[in-house]
From Swiss-Prot:
Binding site for beta-D-fructose 1,6-bisphosphate: K39, R419, E420, M421, L422, R423, Q429, E430, R431
The protein's name in its UniProt record: Glucose-1-phosphate adenylyltransferase
Organism encoding this protein: Escherichia coli O7:K1 (strain IAI39 / ExPEC)
Catalytic reactions on record: alpha-D-glucose 1-phosphate + ATP + H(+) = ADP-alpha-D-glucose + diphosphate
PANTHER family linked: GLUCOSE-1-PHOSPHATE ADENYLYLTRANSFERASE, GLUCOSE-1-PHOSPHATE ADENYLYLTRANSFERASE-RELATED
């Protein structure tokens, strides 16, 4: 383990990101989000009024000083590719800055699509090697968080690790969804189990387990060697969590990086924020939290901006209708191009170009871009997919049986509405 002075830290914080390439795994479908991911990959799902989920990993890279990135895509990638081409094309190739799109092209075998997260990198090794990076940062493109990867890179170098895994405590009842680890006093990982049925607890807190966040830093040459070995292993599922990390742990070369050390937050006393918005309820809840008075995730931090594609739109407009009813909002996010006419919107998130017509009541709802809400509608505890046309007088979120019959209703009572569902009910979706 190497001990560094403050000046050395500052120098490494500048140098290490320049020696690194980030690979963002963005090919997942996100089946737990149900019909919301029927036509788009989970990283391309809208979030927070104007962003896509992948914008958080990409913005973290830029803000951390990493300006060489590869985005590995597979499932329903068109929307994601289009978003990156439109919103992330500002890099200077002459300065060796880029975002490479790496779709599944069956390069290595001629038969297989990506068989697992590790195989997604293996199939692109010929391209990745050309980057000539010293360190490779592996990221999931479907999580919401703010992290300074330069701090994790410093931790990796200080500990003399070949592989570093970002981790954080999670409630033990939720830990079966993650890789779970045990560490020694120097943060060396001494045990790693992927998605255990009975997750082990932390020694100092029996109510929690130490979970992998799916964020890794590797020495580049070591990673390439591991991937080639794994590709030859016919018994491997070719996955980082299931195969590579346990193998590295057994060799004594994996270290843990506590997420609070690199989490970026405006309030140092706040709990570190990281969300896998993989279920409809988690997605709905994380969006609505941004509309609260003091949200858990600070989106207004000028020192750590979240970038995205910014369409040229007019400002949001709140107008009274012909009867004199005023368009009003409270504790809500309303994006550009929206028009609220003689209706009330409370504790909701409205993405761009949403139109809410007269006499409506919108409460605790997430409306994706270009949704049209007809007159006299009541929408509660719901997510309305892009470009849905909600017919006049429709009520959603007040009758559990009716919601479940017409749409998708989660166990927690969150209703998902899509254009296809509305068409099946006989409602035209063209305006």
């Amino acid at each position: 383990m190497v001990s560094l002075e403050k000046n050395d830290h500052l120098m490494l914080a500048r140098q290490l990101p320049l020696k690194s390439v980030a690979l963002i795994l963005a090919g997942g479908r996100g089946t737990r989000l149900k019909d919301l991911t029927n036509k788009r990959a989970k990283p391309a799902v809208h979030f927070g009024g104007k962003f896509r989920i992948i914008d958080f990993a990409l913005s973290n890279c830029i803000n951390s000083g990493i300006r060489r990135m590869g985005v590995i895509t597979q499932y329903q990638s068109h929307t994601l590719v289009q978003h990156i081409q439109r919103g992330w094309s500002f890099f200077n190739e002459e300065m060796n800055e880029f975002v490479d799109l790496l779709p599944a092209q069956q390069r290595m075998k001629g038969e297989n699509w990506y068989r697992g997260t590790a195989d997604a990198v293996t199939q692109n090794l010929d391209i990745i090697r050309r980057y000539k990076a010293e360190y490779v940062v592996i990221l999931a493109g479907d999580h919401i968080y703010k992290q300074d990867y330069s701090r994790m890179l410093i931790d990796h170098v200080e500990k003399g690790a070949r592989c570093t895994v970002a981790c954080m405590p999670v409630p033990i009842e939720e830990a079966s969804a993650f890789g779970v680890m045990a560490v020694d006093e120097n943060d060396k990982i001494i045990e790693f189990v992927e998605k255990p049925a009975n997750p082990p607890s932390m020694p100092n807190d029996p109510s929690k387990s130490l979970a992998s966040m799916g964020i890794y830093v590797f020495d580049a040459d070591y990673l390439y060697e591991l991937l080639e070995e794994d590709d030859r292993d016919k018994n491997s599922s070719h996955d980082f969590g299931k195969d590579l990390i346990p193998k590295i742990t057994e060799a004594g070369l994996a270290y843990a990086h506590p997420f609070p050390l690199s989490c970026v937050q405006s309030d140092p006393d706040a709990e570190p924020y990281w969300r896998d918005v993989g279920t409809l309820e988690a997605y709905w809840k994380a969006n609505l939290d941004l509309a609260s008075v003091v949200p858990e995730l600070d989106m207004y931090d000028r020192n750590w901006p979240i970038r995205t594609y910014n369409e040229s739109l007019p400002p949001a407009k709140f107008v009274q209708d012909r009867s004199g009813s005023h368009g009003m909002t409270l504790n809500s996010l309303v994006s550009g191009g929206c028009v609220i006419s003689g209706s009330v919107v409370v504790q909701s998130v409205l993405f761009s170009r949403v139109r809410v017509n007269s006499f409506c009541n919108i409460d605790s709802a997430v409306l994706l871009p270009e949704v049209w809400v007809g007159r006299s509608c009541r929408l509660r505890r719901c997510v309305i997919d892009r470009a849905c046309v909600i017919p006049e007088g429709m009520v959603i979120g007040e009758n559990a049986e009716e919601d479940a019959r017409r749409f998708y209703r989660s166990e927690e009572g969150i209703v998902l509405v899509t254009r296809e569902m509305l068409r099946k009910l006989g409602h035209k979706q063209e305006r």
